[in-house]
Amino acid sequence: MWLQQRLKGLPGLLSSSWARRLLCLLGLLVLLLWFAGSGARRAAGGLQLLPWPHGEPGAAEPSACLEAATHAWRSLRERGEAVLLGPGVPSLVANGFLALDVVANRLWVTPGEREPAVAPDFVPFVQLRPLSALPEAGESVLLLREGLLRRVRCLQLGTSGPGPAAAGPGPASASGLLTGSGRDCVLLQEDFLAHRGRPHVYLQRIQLNNPTERVAALQTVGPTAGPAPRAFTSTLEKVGDHQFLLYSGRSPPVPTGLVHLVVVAAKKLVDRLQVAPRTQLDETVLWVVHVSGPLNPQVLKSKAAKELKVLQDLARKEMLELLEMPAAELLQDHQRLWAQLFSPGVEMKKITDAHTPSGLTVNLTLYYMLSCSPAPLLSPDLSHRERDQMESTLNYEDHCFSGHATMHAENLWPGRLSSVQQILQLWDLWRLTLQKRGCKGLVRAGAPGILQGMVLSFGGLQFTENHLQFQADPDVLHNSYALHGIRYKNDHINLAVLADAEGKPYLHVSVESRGQLVKIYACEAGCLDEPVELTSAPQGHTFSVMVTQPITPLLYISTDLTHLQDLRHTLHLKAILAHDEHMAQQDPGLPFLFWFSVASLITLFHLFLFKLIYNEYCGPGAKPFFRNKEDPSV
């Protein structure tokens, strides 16, 4: 009865304005508390996704297993050293001779420097499949500093149904990946790479971690575990304790009608991989690829046997050499060479416009171009004489890079690449651009020279006979970036364009000594001040940005002090301005569109005013200018 009376009085209570306000305030407070609580629950749930020490998965759902296995990628991505695969990021691993698309499972071979890449009808990698469709989670990443693609898959264990097999551990059955609970996961990690120091070699490393109490099994699908590809014949080679498959065939004709003979040696792999409970499997599959020069199909029959014999002997010899090496040593050798090759580069610090490529775009472009470039300097078969010749070619300054900077050339630094074929076309464009801009010597040196030319071109650096000059456009220094590892004599120079607290740009230069100490000097535009000796001090050296009239380079670097001192007398400048003074002169004030809009509004206003006056005195029913005394209507 009391409750009924209170409910009858509720409409009257709510009719009060202060009561409605209080009710709305309480409702808003409840909503805020609910959202805060759900956010805290989500945060707590996110922390619980990593239940395994050191990133090792245990019994959990595939998504939680994947989160733990890929947790270390986050810091690599923040440093620009790793890129997740996705739209606009082709899954390419290459070494200048071999190019492999991991996702599409395709192989390209470049027979010669000026020959187009050929695509043999050969499936390059082994595919690992569970024995039945099971829930799984996976992710792939390009590790730019290691030169490989890593794919991680977390596979949830299948159930084998009722019966003795489901009661305890046992071999995998055809009904699932494993026997046992459906909440157990195994971690599969695969590394794909084309070896940087051995141009004919690529490999796939398979690591399967089974932390459960059951046996895990995966079926292998690929040329090393099944029948030979359609265009190839295969033979099993046995030498001592080693055995491998030798495939022989030919590539499809290139547009000119010529064909190439192809021989592939591949390590033999079993049809099914099984891992005992609480153990790990580490298996490395090796391939060696050799191709012939272009052959006319009409003379192929007469030359095929002899050419194939030569290619088979080369592939057999290299495969036996690889099988004698520990697989871990082969992988570490590749990572060491790739890290050495990728030490120079471009670091984007702050971008203030839409036309400058992002750090991700720059790093991906450098990775793809390095992958497509041969590196003869890294070959173990190179003689000392040949190595010295290539080193001298790489250290020869030439006149690279002539012309304006390529920083804003969107066709050279594309924000999106759709396929491996597009990457190969981009590499041809980069090579042609560098050759036409005075970098022929660097291009001949292979991947280290290509990278040096790309770094020089990005910032507008150019070597001359006596110095290295930084000739960036003063109007585009609002972006902050750093160029690392520029070869000069026997040292490496790092040059950065930075901004102070007021937004004014300045230059920061540091030197990394490599071997014999050589004095290096630098002076800013005009060289009016005495050149400064660059040292390997950690803090480096800073230079203000000065702009000359007419425009000359912003910075000069040389080992010849007298040359820099003489420059001030040979430049013949009209004026030297600070960067902000130059920009003030370049700034035309308000944009043209603003003034055009103001002028249009003023014109329209006067036209409207003229129309009013015209309608008042000249339009229909307009009043006369003078009164007529005889007109009674006036």
Swiss-Prot record:
Q: Please state the protein's primary subcellular location.
A: membrane
For this protein, the parts annotated as crossing the membrane are 590-610
Name the keywords, alphabetized. Glycoprotein, Membrane, Signal, Transmembrane, Transmembrane helix
Q: Which residues lie on this side of the membrane: Extracellular?
A: 41-589
The answer on whether this UniProt entry bears the keyword Membrane reads yes
Compartments where found:
Membrane
For this record, the Gene Ontology CC terms, alphabetical, are: membrane
What membrane topology was assigned to this protein in its record? Single-pass type I membrane protein
According to the record, glycans are attached at 363
Name a Pfam family for this protein: DUF2152
Topological domains on the Cytoplasmic side lie at: 611-634
Please list which residues make up the signal peptide.
1-40
Q: What is this protein called?
A: Uncharacterized protein KIAA2013 homolog
